[in-house]
UniProtKB/Swiss-Prot annotation:
GO biological process entries: RNA (guanine-N7)-methylation; tRNA methylation
Residues of the active site: 144
PANTHER family: 3-DEOXY-D-MANNO-OCTULOSONIC-ACID TRANSFERASE/TRNA GUANINE-N 7 - -METHYLTRANSFERASE (PTHR23417), PENTACOTRIPEPTIDE-REPEAT REGION OF PRORP DOMAIN-CONTAINING PROTEIN (PTHR23417:SF14)
Annotated Pfam families: Methyltransf_4
One Gene Ontology MF term: tRNA (guanine(46)-N7)-methyltransferase activity
Reactions that this protein is recorded to catalyse: guanosine(46) in tRNA + S-adenosyl-L-methionine = N(7)-methylguanosine(46) in tRNA + S-adenosyl-L-homocysteine
Superkingdom to which the source organism belongs: Bacteria
GO cellular component: tRNA methyltransferase complex
Residues engaged in binding S-adenosyl-L-methionine: 69, 94, 121, 144
Residues at which substrate binds: 148, 180, 217-220
Protein name: tRNA (guanine-N(7)-)-methyltransferase
Biological function: Catalyzes the formation of N(7)-methylguanine at position 46 (m7G46) in tRNA.
Protein source organism: Salmonella typhimurium (strain LT2 / SGSC1412 / ATCC 700720)
Region Interaction with RNA: start-end pairs: 150-155
Gene: trmB
Length: 239
């Protein structure tokens, strides 16, 4: 697995030329299990970054709806979703190698075969590798809220990013976000509502109840016990 994660800067057209990162690169130390998974399962489930668009039918060995998850953490919920929906294909992107290793180990243990993972900046992957009109779902769960005002520009959900996601979704595809930071939820809602081509799937035109398809993470469970809220947003591509 190549170790060349970068996060380029957006230019005025939303292209990835930036040096402002939406993540802090915390590689951490690999456990023996994570290192074993990277060495043994990456050749099967890992996808190296490429300048060329990916062919999903070739990548997965079949034609099936593709869900892309950005920032899957340790991969527990992503593996659970892939296992629960074997008729679909899942591609996960995570910039921290311990999380990638943990996800690979879990997928192997659970016998999940419809999952592929990448260790690279998601913005560049979207621009370079994901074909337009190819995704059935894009998932972004609990991204860094960058809660200090001077850091708000680092939030991944900005108009250029949301427009980029829109271009990669099929007509009828859905962009599903979740955050436990209310101010970020409001920011997400403002950004998404400003873009022509998305339809808010909330009946109240704001947030949706957590769908059963999104597993509750340990982090989220701990937040519930502390009285923290969680906000889910789902927007469909309609044009």
């Amino acid at each position: 697995m190549k170790n060349d994660v970068i996060s380029p800067e957006f230019d005025e057209n939303g292209r990835p030329l930036r040096r402002i990162r939406s993540f802090v690169r915390r590689q951490g130390r690999l456990t023996k299990g994570q290192e074993h998974a990277l060495e043994n399962y990456w050749p099967v489930m890992g996808v190296e970054f490429s300048e060329a668009p990916v062919d999903f039918a070739t990548l997965f060995g079949r034609e099936a709806p593709v869900t892309l998850e950005i920032g899957f953490g340790m991969g527990a919920s992503l593996v659970a979703m892939a296992k629960a929906r074997p008729e679909q294909n899942f591609l996960g992107i995570e910039v921290h190698s311990p999380g990638v290793g943990a996800c690979l180990a879990s997928a192997n243990e659970e016998g999940v075969e419809n999952l592929r993972v990448m260790c690279h900046d998601a913005v560049e992957v979207l621009h370079k590798m994901i074909p337009d009109n190819s995704l059935s779902m894009v998932q972004l769960f609990f991204p860094d809220p960058w809660h200090k005002a001077r850091h708000n520009k680092r939030r991944i959900v900005q108009v250029p990013f949301a427009e980029l996601v829109l271009s990669k979704l099929k007509l009828g595809g859905v962009f599903h976000m979740a955050t436990d930071w209310e101010a970020y939820a409001e920011h997400m809602l403002e950004v998404m509502s400003s873009i022509d081509g998305y339809k808010n799937l909330s009946e109240s035109n704001d947030y949706v109840p957590r769908p059963e398809s999104r597993p509750v993470t340990k982090f989220e469970q701990r937040g519930h016990r502390l009285g923290h809220g969680v906000w889910d947003l789902m927007f469909e591509r309609v044009k």
